[in-house]
């Protein structure tokens, strides 16, 4: 059990939407105010590398090795447009049906992972751009690792890889992480 607690520390959790995250493979989005599907975002590869590196370093400091996976990052990117919209709805910067949009995001990520014969747990959050630091990531890990660990355990996922999709919009850094087998 101690190993699992250490493993949980390697997972970034959702500072804004953690309580609504579930294992990938969710039930699809609704039609009213649902996921956009066509919204596009520009991924920030430099920030993605920083985000993944921070998670890998943190995990290594807790005895866990997570391999960076471009395939898992691409799965995270599949849900990124809807995650941005959902978090904007949550913080009052957009209108719409948060649950439907978030459901659309998790379905897109789950489908992408499934097509690669992978399973994973997503975690998403947004920081003000000035707050996107390694220290902030560590504080997030410390605050939410227990919840993420529960999701990994319940989904029977042995974390081996990490991927992320990151974009910057209106002074916020939006991050979707996926920890996968």
Positions of predicted regions on the chain:
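Bacterial signal peptide processing site
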Residues: 25-28
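Bacterial Sec-dependent N-terminal signal peptides
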Residues: 1-11
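Alpha-helical transmembrane segments
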Residues: 14-18
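A well-ordered secondary-structure block
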Residues: 100-181
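C-terminal motif of bacterial Sec signal peptides marking the signal peptidase cleavage site
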Residues: 19-23
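Short, well-ordered surface patches within globular domains
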Residues: 33-107, 162
């Amino acid at each position: 059990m101690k190993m699992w607690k250490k493993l949980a520390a390697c997972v970034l959790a959702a500072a804004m939407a953690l309580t609504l995250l579930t294992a990938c493979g969710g039930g699809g989005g609704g039609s009213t105010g649902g996921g956009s599907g066509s919204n596009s975002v520009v991924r920030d590869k430099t920030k993605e590398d920083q985000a993944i590196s921070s998670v890998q370093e943190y995990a290594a400091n807790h005895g866990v090795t997570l391999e960076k996976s471009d395939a898992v990052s691409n799965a995270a990117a599949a849900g990124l447009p809807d995650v941005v919209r959902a978090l904007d709805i949550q913080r009052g910067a957009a209108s719409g049906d948060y649950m439907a949009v978030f459901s659309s995001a998790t379905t897109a990520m789950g489908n992408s992972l499934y097509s690669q014969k992978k399973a994973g747990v997503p975690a998403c959050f947004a920081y003000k751009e000035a707050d996107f630091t390694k220290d902030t990531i560590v504080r997030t890990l410390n605050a939410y690792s227990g919840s993420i660990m529960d999701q990994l355990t319940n989904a029977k996922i042995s974390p081996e890889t990490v991927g992320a999709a990151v974009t910057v919009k209106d002074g916020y850094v939006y991050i979707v992480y996926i920890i996968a087998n």
